[in-house]
From Swiss-Prot:
Keyword hit for Metal-binding: yes
Protein name stated in the entry: Shikimate kinase
GO cellular component, one term: cytosol
This enzyme's EC code(s): 2.7.1.71
Chemical reaction(s) catalysed: shikimate + ATP = 3-phosphoshikimate + ADP + H(+)
The protein's required cofactors: Mg(2+)
Role according to the record: Catalyzes the specific phosphorylation of the 3-hydroxyl group of shikimic acid using ATP as a cosubstrate.
Organism name: Aeromonas salmonicida (strain A449)
Length: 172
C-alpha cells in the first residue's frame, strides 16, 4: 500500500477544522485547503448563496467534486465541511487518499464557537441551533467514526496543541 501523504480533517461545524488545519499545515510544511473556501472560489459566490440558490443538494454536489479534486493532490492538509462525509464517494476517497482525523467536539462548544457566525447556512433556520446541532450529530457521528483513522477531542484545547497531538498521532 502506498504511504498516505495527505491529512484530511473531518468533524462537525465548530470543531476547529480550519483553524487546526492551518496550524497543522504550517507545522508540517504542507499546503492547506479548506473545502468551503475552495467551493466559494470556484463558484464565485459564498456558501450561503450556493445554499439559497442550489439548496443543500446542489452544495453537496459541488463539495463532492472539490474534495475529489483536492484529494488527488499529495502533501496537503484539507479541512472538509461538516457534512462532507454524507457522501459515500467522498468518504471512500478520503479513506483511500490520506489520513483521516475526526475532530470531535461537544454541542456546547459548537454553540459557543458558532453563535455569532452568520456564514453557516444550516444554522440560519427557524429551528433552534442546539436542536440543529443535535440532529446533525445524530445523523453524522457514526459516519465520522466510520472513516476516521484517528479521533481527537478539541474541547478546551488550543488549535496549536491539537495540531501537535495530530503530528504525534500520525508520526509525521
Amino acid at each position: 500500500m502506498a504511504e498516505k501523504r495527505n491529512i484530511f480533517l473531518i468533524g462537525p461545524m465548530g470543531a476547529g477544522k480550519s483553524t487546526i488545519g492551518r496550524h497543522l499545515a504550517e507545522q508540517l510544511h504542507m499546503e492547506f485547503f479548506d473545502s468551503d473556501h475552495e467551493i466559494e472560489r470556484r463558484s464565485g459566490a459564498d456558501i450561503g448563496w450556493v445554499f439559497d440558490v442550489e439548496g443543500e443538494e446542489g452544495f453537496r454536489i459541488r463539495e463532492e467534486k472539490v474534495i475529489g479534486d483536492l484529494s488527488e493532490q499529495q502533501g496537503i492538509v484539507l479541512a472538509t465541511g461538516g457534512g462532507a462525509i454524507k457522501s459515500r464517494e467522498t468518504r471512500n476517497k478520503l479513506s483511500a487518499r490520506g489520513i483521516v482525523v475526526y475532530l470531535e467536539t461537544t454541542i456546547e462548544k459548537q454553540l459557543a464557537r458558532t453563535q455569532r457566525d452568520k456564514r453557516r447556512p444550516l444554522l440560519q433556520t427557524e429551528e433552534p441551533p442546539r436542536e440543529v446541532l443535535e440532529r446533525l450529530a445524530q445523523e453524522r457521528n457514526a459516519l465520522y467514526e466510520e472513516v476516521a483513522d484517528f479521533v481527537i477531542q478539541t474541547d478546551d484545547q488550543s488549535a496549536k496543541i491539537v495540531a501537535n497531538q495530530i503530528v504525534k498521532l500520525i508520526g509525521m
